[in-house]
Amino acid sequence: MSIEQLAETAQAMVASGKGIIAIDESAGTIAKRFSSVGIENIEENRRAYRELLLTTPKLSDYISGAILFDETIRQSTKAGVPFPKYMAEHGIIPGIKVDKGAYPLAGCPGELVTEGLDGLRARLEEYYKLGARFAKWRAVINIGDDIPSGMCIDANVHALARYAALCQEQGLVPMVEPEVIMDGNHDISAAYEVTEATLRSLFNALYEQNVVLEGTILKASMVIPGTDCEEQASIDEVAESTVMCLKSTVPAILPGIVFLSGGQTDAQSTAHLNAMNQFDPLPWPLSFSYGRAMQQAALKLWSQDMKGNFAKAQQVVYERAKENGLAALGKWKG
């Protein structure tokens, strides 16, 4: 795929007033989500749930793409239409999570490094044939006593850049996600410092690996205090700190930035995004790539009556998409 085609896909992913829905939960994560609402974790239930999300009527009004898990990209609707084909026909770009998870980084207690580079070229080639047009790789950066170390940041951004270069070689837009974890008692200034250092290192690594930024999307953490911090920040403080951090680290040529919700409540994730989009002008679109913050209300409703509440749960998904789509324009009223 040419640079022009990659850039076109990346721009479509951050189209005005639209975001990405993340439904790429691993087998272990979806098992926990199902267990929390009493749904049996079997393949048919997972397929049916993904169908509920992806076939929500008029979803493409506010959703430009969806990140799938390996199992999901191979599944089909009840009518037998492969999910990627259904998505493409309904204006939603298929994406695929390709990392293999975060594991302890040897020599660095309390720190993690993401694995999955081995065999990635062949997997990306297959995913492209299955219909994927973008991919996602998540790095995990913990904040604690004397962490993250420079070694941890370097190891993770190097892997992100190698992944991104391989994606572009195979015609997929890389979504790079260096998640600064909310767990801990760190304050907002510590979150800012770590996020800034991580993003600075990431874009240096992308440059060194010849990654074309015009065909790349950043999935970023908001600059937010740790969940156990005694002094929580206001919506405006989070928005201002996040925008300032991004402006100091992210090149303006990037097509756009989408945020992860990272354990925020539904209302927080929408309010923070809306507040950030009050800042004008911004060098790039700021939108969303939410998982839990898009799904949890619908999942709870569906679990109460999987047949009877199917359409009602889809309406909840649509409403959450609409709220976040408005927030991506700075027009959410709460």
UniProtKB/Swiss-Prot annotation:
Enzyme class, broadest EC rank: lyase
InterPro entries per UniProt: Aldolase_I_AS, Aldolase_TIM, FBA_I
The organism of origin for this protein: Xylella fastidiosa (strain Temecula1 / ATCC 700964)
Coiled coil ranges: none
Entry-linked CDD domains: FBP_aldolase_I_a
Assigned EC number: 4.1.2.13
GO molecular function terms attached to this record: fructose-bisphosphate aldolase activity
PANTHER family with a match to the protein in the record: FRUCTOSE-BISPHOSPHATE ALDOLASE
Full protein name: Probable fructose-bisphosphate aldolase class 1
Stored PROSITE patterns: ALDOLASE_CLASS_I
Family annotation (SUPFAM superfamilies): Aldolase (SSF51569)
Catalyzed reactions: beta-D-fructose 1,6-bisphosphate = D-glyceraldehyde 3-phosphate + dihydroxyacetone phosphate
UniProt pathway: Carbohydrate degradation; glycolysis; D-glyceraldehyde 3-phosphate and glycerone phosphate from D-glucose: step 4/4
UniProt superkingdom: Bacteria
Keywords linked to the UniProt accession: Glycolysis, Lyase
GO BP, sorted A to Z: glycolytic process
Family according to the record: Belongs to the class I fructose-bisphosphate aldolase family.
